[in-house]
Amino acid sequence: MKSRIALSVLFVLIAAATFAQSDAQKSSAAPAPSEAQKSFTTMKSLAGEWEGPVTVADAPEMSGAKMHLSLRVTSRGNALVHEFQEAGTPLDATKYDHPVTMLYVDGDQLTLIHYCDAGNRPRMTGKMSPDGKTVEFEFKDISGSPEYHMHHAVFTLIDANHHTEDWTFMMKDKPMHAHFDLQRKN
């Protein structure tokens, strides 16, 4: 009889511990990702090497140049490095324009900082479109001279191997738009 009672108590204790552990796991489950985190996850899906032409309506002599883009996830998945260069040019910052852009989540905002060859660092915040295919960045502020700076960016995902980027550069008060049509290289 005592062994049956002890066995019954043991089963009750095991069941109670199992349910308590199950409830603890439910309450410690990760919260749903924020809109900024969802947008960042979308941006990280672009990691890799890309190439394609640029179109600049305001400067036809620049149109048609083949560009190379490297997108790399770094810092344990917390940052995305975006680096443009003209295809076929060496990585020599003293001779060629190789702007670097960093993307990351800051609180509840997807943030982009563009380290420009103009010597400034515009900061933009991004939002994903309802269909999840476009992330648009709006100018927030700038470190350095605001006279010439990147002011706006739009990333549009066509499919896993094709995306476009539209960047707006401010030349004093005049916007200059550049459209990049990029195909995955790897």
Tell me the role of every PLM-derived stretch:
Residues 21-186:
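Hydrophobic small-molecule pocket/channel-lining residues, especially in calycin-type beta-barrels
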